[in-house]
């Protein structure tokens, strides 16, 4: 399973993340930053670019998001969107995604595949 971070943060902000958490670079196949796409979330550009990079389609792409703009961007990309109620409440996140998680405890690959649009 290929995984990427698709962030509205720029390279400079991500450099600070890498200094604080160097392991982040090795946890993902790609990290796509704001310099790589023209419009920020809630536009779907970052997710569409991610699909292009991995040569995949919305039907086989899962977006995990906690921000409102990220959730909107994921839905606009037509991927399956899993909302994380880590920053905002379940009630606020639920209308903007296909499934809501409080955290990743007990969430497996098989459970992810059971989430449908």
Model-based region annotation:
Residues 10-117:
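Asp-based, Mg2+/Mn2+-dependent phosphohydrolase catalytic module
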């Amino acid at each position: 399973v290929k995984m990427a971070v698709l962030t509205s943060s720029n390279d400079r902000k991500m450099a600070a993340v890498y200094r604080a958490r160097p392991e982040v670079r090795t946890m993902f196949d790609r990290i796509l930053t704001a310099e790589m796409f023209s419009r920020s979330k809630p536009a779907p550009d970052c997710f569409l670019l991610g699909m292009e990079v991995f040569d995949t389609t919305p039907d086989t792409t899962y977006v995990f998001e906690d921000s409102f703009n990220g959730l909107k961007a994921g839905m606009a990309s037509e991927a399956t969107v899993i909302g994380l109620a880590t920053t905002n409440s379940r009630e606020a996140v639920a209308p903007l995604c296909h499934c809501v998680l409080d955290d990743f405890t007990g969430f497996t690959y098989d459970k992810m595949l059971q989430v449908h649009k």
